[in-house]
Amino acid sequence: MIARRALSDPSRTVREIYRRLSLAWGPQHWWPAESPFEVVVGAFLTQNTSWTNVEKAIAGLRAAGALSAQGVRELGIHELEQLIRPSGYFRQKAKRLKEFVKFLDSRYGGSVEKMLQQPTAHIREELLVLNGIGPETADSILLYAGSHPIFVVDAYSRRVLERHEAVSANAKYDEIREIVERALQREAATTRPGLESLSENRPVVHPASAMSMMSRDARVQVLNEMHGLFVQLGKHHCAKKEPACDRCPLGDLLGHPTGRDTSRNRRARAARRQGAAKEKSRKWRV
């Protein structure tokens, strides 16, 4: 257990969070998918919706035999829209999936596997140019579809790390990503706790899938698990408004349930939310 004064050391804080959560909750089985292309589809569909809705949309694509680049390519745009309708923003998402497949066809012969064989920085740069792909979506594709050693920053990880004072309220996406990657560089994922050692309060995890169980480099597996653990923590304990710290594996690391929620941090969060809302409005008009 780390002393509370050590919470100002971002790397040490991140490592302690990872160790505690992985011991308490075990493997998270992310990403729940059967192929790299399914991961890509899920990364698009999960934008601005719950994973439950994504699962409904993916089930529709699978039933239609369209959960592949060829399947998306051959579908009419209206048919694709209807299949992914449960995920919300279905017209924009259908257009973006079509554009991604067109990119895949023009650069990599329609093969997502060929794309993912390229260097991490090269793929990331290409993905970020595409309509509807921001850093979180690009990094989800890289980490979960291609096993590239890159951390996915989302609202959950940002919230947890802010409250534990590992990052500031106005930290940029890549700043947070690099802090986590640096902190977990030496962690090993080869030894995992058995189910008998897990906390009785362990949240429900996804069933193991072909993609979640694929062989990975140890560092990639750590980054994979860390993201899944942050998601669980954000959903079940570190809520936006009323965090449930009493049964949280990290509860004793904070002197107050929400940490030092200073006026400066609140102003920074408000400014970031306002900026994100403007950016979201701009993107969805494209």
Where are these regions (language model features)?
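Acidic, low-complexity intrinsically disordered tails
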Residues: R267-V286
